[in-house]
């Protein structure tokens, strides 16, 4: 896989995370409370400062009342 494509995916995921939180009408602090993490964790995840693993992604989706498969499909189709 080309580095440019790899880098693009890492930029798309944080955007999707932020979009899902906003769509759910949650602040960073409210989502953090649902996930039992700090708001700094949410901020760093949404800015790409830290990577999110697949289990964290699934938990994030569920906390935002979004189907993880639907969200992952959206991410996979993003360009």
Roles of regions detected by a PLM:
Residues 36-52:
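Recognition helix of helix-turn-helix/homeodomain-like DNA-binding domains
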Residues 12, 23, 49-52, 63:
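Helix-turn-helix/winged-helix DNA-binding modules
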Residues 17, 31-32, 42-45, 71:
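Conserved hydrophobic/aromatic packing and binding residues within compact polymer-binding modules
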Residues 15-34, 59:
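Short basic helix-loop element that most often maps to the first helix and adjoining turn
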Residues 70-79:
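Short amphipathic recognition helices of helix-turn-helix/homeodomain-type DNA-binding modules
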Residues 1-23:
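A short, Lys/Arg-rich alpha-helix, primarily the initiator
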Residues 55-71:
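DNA major-groove recognition helix of helix-turn-helix/homeodomain DNA-binding modules
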């Amino acid at each position: 896989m080309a580095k440019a494509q790899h880098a693009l995916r890492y930029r798309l995921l944080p955007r999707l995370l932020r979009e899902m939180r906003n769509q759910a009408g949650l602040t960073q602090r409210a989502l953090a409370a649902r996930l039992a993490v700090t708001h700094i964790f949410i901020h760093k995840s949404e800015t790409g400062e830290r990577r999110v693993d697949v289990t964290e992604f699934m938990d994030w989706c569920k906390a935002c009342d979004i189907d993880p498969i639907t969200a992952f499909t959206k991410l996979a189709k993003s360009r």
